[in-house]
Structure formats: structure tokens, C-alpha cells
Curated annotation (Swiss-Prot):
Its EC number is 4.3.2.1. Strongly inhibited by L-arginine. Inhibitory effects are lowered at pH 7.0 compared to those at pH 8.0. At 42 degrees Celsius and pH 8.0, activity decreases to 77% and 25% in the presence of 1 mM and 10 mM arginine, respectively. The other amino and organic acids do not affect activity. GO terms for cellular component: cytosol. This is Argininosuccinate lyase. It is found in: Cytoplasm. Keywords: Amino-acid biosynthesis, Arginine biosynthesis, Cytoplasm, Lyase. Its main location: cytoplasm. Optimum pH is 8.0. Shows more than 35% enzymatic activity in terms of relative activity at pH 7.0-9.5. It is an enzyme of class 4 (lyase). It comes from Nostoc sp. (strain PCC 7120 / SAG 25.82 / UTEX 2576).
């Protein structure tokens, strides 16, 4: 890094090369260049609008910045480490293009409010992209659910067979998680969509700027009311990382279930070749790499959230260099969430097949209909807790005899309690067990069909 920095006039000696490298952020904040250019164009227009610079100078600056955008997109502008950061890289190139007029761009602006603006512009776009991905993920879940309203799957608590449910009902649980994620990102967007531009280094500026004008140009909903808060706030980034972490929680939970379902012990799903990998030594293997990677990458996003919280917890007002550390974790979290949503959507849509025959067998090979026996007695006047205790003893006796409840004879049922009649067999059949749970939000087929239709409307279909 041999060139003098913009701020170097106050210093008598050059920055140590290793420190210059340590201090530089251009290697990662180049991600913000398009947003930096857009924000700078709005700032230049405002300077001209308020008479701080001439209209002709404003036009020169805007045109020069647009030329840099084209150069960057064509691969002709690739700033090196000597630029320190994306802001200086742009300003230097702008001055090369338009001459000394380029040096007027930074009038009434600091890198502190500039980077805050860039990051918010970036995150606005990314939130909208992730929301679009969430909608596609939801559509795929609904497509599968719609075809499997009456497909049964064991439901679990404590990873022990509990009660059978509709496969569609199970998938709709993930739809609802994704819906909360979608709504949560909308809430975050509102607090991202606030302009700090014009807050200056920390105290505002002596120039007669118009912050509302730049906010309007950049389509910000409002502006920061306090300049100290505007340049030091990273709540919006933390909120996004919280929302991103919850998206990853939900994807990771689904991933864990798919990993289990694909195992020989469960055999509920088949992983198609397009979304699985093999072993370098064991030729029989088909590995669930996609859900395993999603599960693993979840920790990265959690880590970035924790890092951001730790960065912020002890910072005095206003800007501190610590805040340079907000970007890499933010960028990586955005990229991780987007990649995982894409991979999981493809996996569900193209790489997964439910083994419906195996699922049908699975729901008949356990005691997950025991609650329905208790409900059967309770519906016939036996207090539920008494019925519960009776059925608990029945299950214990059946296990000892190597029988399932469906294998008991009517005589055996009536020896247990005289209220049992021959309709007990229908009451404890898996399909009836599921169909009977027709309370709002339950797994009954009628309720699930309504839920699928309501979900379609929720996402605008």
C-alpha cells in the first residue's frame, strides 16, 4: 500500500504496511460498491439541489459515478488493497474521471454516515430477495402437502412415536415457520429502511443539506432523528441476524428430520441421485449432504449474530473502528441463508420422494392410537384420567403379550372395560385416529385441506 491515504495529511510518517493491510476493508466491503455509487449519486444530487455545488457539477458527479458502475460491471474497475475501502476507491476513481470536481463529492458527508447508508441499501435488497425465496420454499411445501393430505406419517414427541398425523399437516408446520420468517423480515425491513445520510461523522454538518431529499431519492421511509444514533446504530443488522438465525433454525429442524427419514432405521423418504452424494470407500452409501450442510451452516449464522452482539455491547458513542467488523458476518449470513433456502427448495421439489407404503405400515406398528382408546372411554362417560390409567395398563399388558391394540379380541377388550364395543377397531384405525382430530388447526383431513387452501391465499395464490 504505497499511495497516500485521503486522511494522511495530518500524519508525518506513512502507515506501516502491515497495519495498512490490517486496517483495510476493501477486500470485503467491495460488496457494497453498487450501493455506494447509488448513495453517492443521491448525495451529489442533493448538493446541487441545495446550491452547495452547481447543477453542472452535480451532473458531472452523477455521470462519473455511473461510469464507475459500468466499469465495475465490466470488470474494468477492480480497486486494489491500496484503496483502503470502497468509499476511497470510488472517490479516487471519480476524481480521475471528472477531475477536481470529484473532490467535492464528500462535502457534508462522512464515511460514517456513508457506510451506514450503503449497508442499509444493501440489506434492503437482500431482505426482499430472501422474502422471495421464502415464498418459493413455501410454495414447494404446499405443492407436496396438497398431494399428501391423506398420507399418514408417525408423529413424535421426545422422538418417540406419539400420534399419527397427516403428512401435509407435518409439512404445513414448516410452512407456518416460514411464514413467521417472512413476516419477521418485513418488520426488520422497516427499521433497515431509515436513512442516516447527512448525519455526518457524528454531529451533523454546517452545510444547508436536505436529508429528506436524499431519503426520498433513495426511497428510504424516514430519516434518523439523532445524528449520533444514526452513525452508531447497528440494531438493524442485529435484528436481521436474529431473523436470519431463526430462518436457519427452521431449515435445520427440517434438515434433521429429512436426515432421520432417509436413514435405514426410518426409511420414510428416498433421496434422489440429483440431491445426494456417495462415499469414497463404502460403495453402498447415499449420503444426505444437503440437509447435513444446512444443519452445519446454521452454526455460522448463529456465530455471526453472537459476534455482532459482542461487538456492540461495549461501544461508546458514536462511530468506532470495531464497526468495520459488522460486514463480513452480515454478508456471509445473507449468502448462507440464500444458499440454504435455494438448496432446501430444490431438495424438496426434485430430490425427495416419500415412501408412502412404508409410512402406511409405520403408523400401524405401534401404540400411537392409545390416546384414542382413552378418548373412546371418555366419550362414553368414563372420566378421562380413569380411562387414561385403564389404557396404560392395557398397553403394558399388550406389550408383554407381544400384541398391538388392534390385535386384541373383542372379548379381551370387554374384559378390560364393559364400555368397549366392536366399533373400537374403527376408532383406533390410523385413518380414523387422524380424521377424528378435526379441531381447528388439528390434523384431521378436513382441517388440513382447509389449511392448505388458507395457506395458498396467504402467499397470494
Amino acid at each position: 500500500m504505497t499511495e497516500k491515504q485521503t486522511w494522511s495529511q495530518r500524519f508525518e510518517s506513512a502507515l506501516h504496511p502491515a497495519i495498512a493491510l490490517f486496517n483495510a476493508s476493501i477486500s470485503f466491503d467491495i460488496e457494497l460498491i453498487e450501493y455506494d455509487l447509488t448513495g453517492s449519486q443521491a448525495h451529489a444530487q442533493m448538493l446541487a439541489h441545495t446550491g452547495i455545488i452547481s447543477p453542472a457539477e452535480g451532473e458531472q458527479l452523477v455521470a462519473g459515478l455511473e461510469q464507475i458502475r459500468e466499469e465495475y460491471r465490466q470488470g474494468k474497475f477492480q480497486p486494489g488493497i491500496d484503496a483502503e475501502d470502497v468509499h476511497f476507491a470510488v472517490e479516487r476513481r471519480l476524481t480521475e474521471i471528472v477531475g477536481d470536481v470529484g473532490k467535492k463529492l464528500h462535502t457534508a458527508r462522512s464515511r460514517n454516515d456513508q457506510v451506514g447508508t450503503d449497508t442499509r441499501l444493501y440489506l434492503r435488497d437482500q431482505i426482499l430477495q430472501i422474502k422471495t425465496q421464502l415464498r418459493e420454499f413455501q410454495r414447494v411445501l404446499l405443492d407436496i402437502a396438497e398431494k399428501n393430505v391423506e398420507t399418514l406419517i408417525p408423529g413424535y414427541t421426545h422422538l418417540q412415536r406419539a400420534q399419527p398425523v397427516s403428512l401435509a399437516h407435518h409439512l404445513l408446520a414448516y410452512f407456518q415457520m416460514a411464514q413467521r420468517d417472512w413476516e419477521r423480515l418485513g418488520d426488520v425491513y422497516r427499521r433497515v429502511n431509515i436513512s442516516p445520510l447527512g448525519c455526518g461523522a457524528l454531529a451533523g454538518t454546517t452545510f444547508p443539506i436536505d436529508r429528506h431529499y436524499t431519503a426520498e431519492l433513495l426511497q428510504f421511509e424516514r430519516i434518523y432523528e439523532n445524528s449520533l444514533d444514526g452513525v452508531s446504530d447497528r440494531d438493524f443488522a442485529i435484528e436481521f441476524l436474529c431473523a436470519a438465525s431463526l430462518i436457519m433454525v427452521h431449515l435445520s429442524r427440517l434438515s434433521e428430520e429429512i436426515i432421520l427419514w432417509a436413514s435405514e432405521e426410518f426409511r420414510f423418504v428416498i433421496l434422489k441421485d440429483s440431491c445426494a452424494t456417495g462415499s469414497s470407500i463404502m460403495p453402498q452409501k447415499k449420503n444426505p449432504d444437503v440437509p447435513e450442510l444446512v444443519r452445519g451452516k446454521t452454526g455460522r449464522v448463529f456465530g455471526h449474530l453472537q459476534a455482532m452482539l459482542v461487538i456492540m455491547k461495549g461501544l461508546p458513542l458514536a462511530y468506532n473502528k470495531d464497526l468495520q467488523e459488522d460486514k463480513e458476518g452480515l454478508f456471509d449470513s445473507v449468502n448462507t441463508v440464500k444458499a440454504c433456502l435455494e438448496a432446501m427448495t430444490i431438495l424438496l421439489q426434485e430430490g425427495l420422494e416419500f415412501r408412502t407404503q412404508r409410512l402406511a405400515e409405520a403408523v400401524t406398528q405401534d401404540f400411537s392410537n392409545a390416546t384414542d382408546v382413552a378418548d373412546y372411554l371418555a366419550a362414553r362417560g368414563v372420566p378421562f384420567r380413569e380411562a387414561y390409567n385403564i389404557v396404560g395398563k392395557v398397553v403394558k399388558t399388550s406389550i408383554a403379550a407381544g400384541k398391538l391394540l388392534k390385535d386384541l379380541t373383542l372379548e379381551e377388550w370387554q374384559q378390560i372395560h364393559p364400555k368397549f364395543a366392536d366399533d373400537i377397531y374403527e376408532a383406533i384405525s390410523p385413518r380414523q385416529v387422524v380424521a377424528a382430530r378435526n379441531s381447528y388447526g388439528g390434523t384431521g383431513f378436513a382441517q388440513v385441506s382447509k389449511a392448505v387452501s388458507a395457506a395458498r391465499k396467504e402467499i397470494g395464490e
